[in-house]
């Protein structure tokens, strides 16, 4: 428009076709500006707000903020296997929202989480359950559960520890730990994982155990001829390629003076579950294995008595969001960020701390 003149100063009527233009910068750029005077105004492109300089600092003029939609994969630490014909550890709880991919326990994909730029949220990567060592006199009750993993309001439950001699069942967890001779596997958590496998009864000098539950399948029952296998994990493409995680640990088997072979080992479930071990009075077949780090895999059980089981694998937290945003951490977390198509993917592999988007 033509505008009006007041005391020699022309104020232009821009109309709706000529909006007032304010210089836009990122938050980092604004904080680096120099030479400002009180009343200067800029647009913060990260937070979606107008800011005015008061002579000392920049202050937001409006309450409007940008919302960030985040897809996630949150896997807790896996439970450790046990010793003394111990079962396999259960996989860490598995919760997923990306691309309609399933969560653990056969449940549907969860909803994406929405947060606001500049708002802090917590990320915690759960540790795997610590290995246990048998004493040879039947005093080991159970191995150890894994620790929970957290993204904001989303929490996944640590995998269940396994049962051990004598008469100790598997523990409940994200996925349940496998039972020891003549006991049941632990229960998995609804929407996160499956139950651990049961263990068959003693057969002479043969003692068996069940496999740990996985995010994608229950652990199998242990037999006199073979320890139970760990349950399978679940595949996700949140990082841009398909990766299977959260497999249960294989069970351990003790066969006394009977023949033993590698074929009797309880195999770890696909997705990071550790293999178990078979032992007779002369030999050990395949030393037990730990669950794979950052998969939440369960640890393998051991057939022997004065032996050490497989530790559970640590968990992982993976976040996928628009590449328009960046994530920052206040410390205490180990993570990397990669660009995948039009998104960024941040993978947290250890620690706990607060983060925010900008």
Question: Where are the regions a protein language model picked out?
Answer:
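Low-complexity, glycine/proline-biased repetitive segments and flexible coils/loops
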Residues: 69-358
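Extracellular beta-strand solenoids
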Residues: 1, 6-18, 22, 44, ...
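Extracellular/surface-exposed low-complexity repeats and stalk/linker segments enriched in Gly/Pro
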Residues: 9-41, 45-47, 62
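Short beta-strand segments and strand-loop junctions that repeat across beta-rich extracellular domains
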Residues: 48-56
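Short, solvent-exposed secondary-structure boundary motifs
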Residues: 1-2, 27-38, 225-228, 324-330
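Tryptophan-rich substrate-binding surfaces of secreted polymer-degrading and adhesive proteins
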Residues: 56-64
């Amino acid at each position: 428009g033509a505008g009006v003149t007041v005391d020699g100063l022309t104020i232009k009527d821009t109309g709706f076709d000529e909006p007032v233009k304010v210089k836009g910068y990122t938050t980092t750029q604004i904080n680096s500006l120099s030479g400002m005077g009180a009343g200067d105004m800029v647009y913060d492109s990260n937070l979606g707000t107008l800011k005015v300089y008061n002579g000392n600092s920049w202050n937001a003029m409006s309450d409007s903020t940008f919302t960030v939609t985040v897809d996630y994969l949150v896997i807790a630490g896996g439970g450790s296997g046990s010793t003394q014909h111990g079962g396999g550890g259960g996989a860490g709880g598995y919760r997923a929202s990306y691309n309609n991919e399933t969560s653990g326990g056969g449940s549907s994909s969860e909803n994406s989480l929405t947060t606001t730029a500049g708002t802090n949220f917590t990320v915690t990567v759960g540790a795997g359950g610590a290995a246990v060592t048998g004493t040879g006199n039947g005093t080991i009750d159970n191995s150890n559960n894994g620790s929970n993993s957290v993204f904001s309001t989303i929490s996944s439950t640590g995998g269940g520890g396994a049962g051990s001699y004598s008469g100790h069942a598997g523990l409940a967890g994200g996925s349940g730990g496998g039972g020891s001779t003549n006991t049941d596997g632990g229960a998995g958590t609804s929407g996160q994982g499956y139950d651990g496998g049961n263990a068959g009864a003693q057969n002479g000098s043969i003692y068996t155990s069940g496999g740990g539950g996985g995010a994608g399948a229950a652990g199998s029952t242990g037999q006199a001829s073979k320890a139970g296998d760990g349950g399978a994990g679940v595949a996700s493409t949140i990082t841009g390629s398909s990766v299977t995680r959260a497999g249960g640990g294989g069970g351990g088997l003790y066969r006394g003076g009977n023949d033993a072979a590698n074929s009797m080992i309880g195999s770890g479930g696909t997705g990071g579950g550790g293999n178990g071990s078979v032992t007779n009075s002369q030999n050990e077949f395949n030393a037990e294995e730990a669950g794979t780090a950052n998969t939440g895999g369960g640890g393998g059980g051991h057939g022997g008595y004065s032996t050490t089981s497989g530790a559970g694998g640590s968990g992982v937290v993976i976040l996928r969001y628009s590449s328009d945003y960046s994530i920052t951490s206040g410390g205490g977390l180990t993570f990397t960020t990669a660009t995948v198509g039009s998104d960024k993917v941040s993978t947290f592999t250890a620690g706990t701390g607060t983060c925010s988007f900008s």
